[in-house]
Each structure stands twice: as structure tokens, then as C-alpha cells.
From Swiss-Prot:
Superkingdom of the organism of origin: Eukaryota
InterPro entries: Thyroxine_BS (IPR023418), Transthyretin/HIU_hydrolase (IPR000895), Transthyretin/HIU_hydrolase_d (IPR023416), Transthyretin/HIU_hydrolase_sf (IPR036817), Transthyretin_CS (IPR023419)
Role of this protein: Thyroid hormone-binding protein. Probably transports thyroxine from the bloodstream to the brain.
Name the record gives this protein: Transthyretin
Protein's cellular compartments: Secreted
Source species: Macaca fascicularis (Crab-eating macaque)
Modified residues (Phosphoserine): 72
GO process annotations (BP): purine nucleobase metabolic process
Length: 147
């Protein structure tokens, strides 16, 4: 029964994260946004380091963008529509440092999402992550840019 409650909590958190709109940011100018939620405390995960990489022609990962989540658990302004061209990208969320800052020893070093972007034309991507010390879930919301 406890596992069912945990599953429902995780699903509810994913719905919350994926449905919530950006806070005070013009979504039409944000082609890549990351949202991070702390499932243990039921709150935004603040000050979480996020690194974005782009796969190069030689199959290596080149640094593309980085930043930290805000008080709302969101990270905007990672790139522009002009820079965010078709390709394979990796979003790496530093979960270990986040949990260590709260005095918790986590299992994972980081959460990672690898995806193909803009292969069907320009799109806007919201990568959402729901974190706990021993697990994480991710989802993506992909939309057409607003004119």
C-alpha cells in the first residue's frame, strides 16, 4: 500500500511540474527550460546546477549551456532560438550536490535526459524532473513556438 501512495505522489508531482507554466518569463522566447521539483519536501528544488551538452559530429559531448534553478525551481534563458539548432542534447541535473546541501546522502550523482531537438522544425522544450534521494522521474513538454 505504501508503494501505491508513493507512485501516486510521484505521478501527481509529474502532472504538477509538466502542467505549471513558467513564472514571470515570456515563454515564447525560451526554447529550452528546465524545472526541478523536490518530491520529498513537495517544493521547488532551488539552486540546482544544470548543465546542457550538445552531441558533436565526433560523438563527443560539447558544453552548450549551464545555470542554476531559481526559487521557483525553474531555469530559463539557457539558450536562444538561433543557437538551439537541430541536434542531440543532454541535460544533466546535479542531484548529488542538491541532496548533500540538505544533509542527505543520495544514490545518484545526477539525473540525465538525452533528446533530439528541432528535427521537425523549431520547438520549445520544457524538461521537468521530480527528485528524491534514491530515484528521479523526468518528463518533457514539447510545443510549437508562439508567434
Amino acid at each position: 500500500m505504501a508503494s501505491h501512495r508513493l507512485l501516486l505522489l510521484c505521478l501527481a508531482g509529474l502532472v504538477f511540474v509538466s502542467e505549471a507554466g513558467p513564472t514571470g518569463v515570456d515563454e515564447s522566447k525560451c526554447p529550452l527550460m528546465v524545472k526541478v521539483l523536490d518530491a520529498v519536501r513537495g517544493s521547488p528544488a532551488v539552486n540546482v546546477a544544470v548543465n546542457v551538452f550538445k552531441k558533436a559530429a565526433d560523438e563527443t559531448w560539447a558544453p552548450f549551456a549551464s545555470g542554476k534553478t531559481s526559487e521557483s525551481g525553474e531555469l530559463h534563458g539557457l539558450t536562444t532560438e538561433e543557437e538551439f539548432v537541430e541536434g542531440i542534447y543532454k541535460v544533466e541535473i546535479d542531484t548529488k550536490s542538491y541532496w548533500k546541501s540538505l544533509g542527505i546522502s543520495p544514490f545518484h550523482e545526477h539525473a540525465e535526459v538525452v533528446f533530439t531537438a528541432n528535427d521537425s522544425g523549431p520547438r520549445h522544450y520544457t524538461i521537468a524532473a521530480l527528485l528524491s534521494p534514491y530515484s528521479y522521474s523526468t518528463t518533457a513538454v514539447v510545443t510549437n513556438p508562439k508567434e
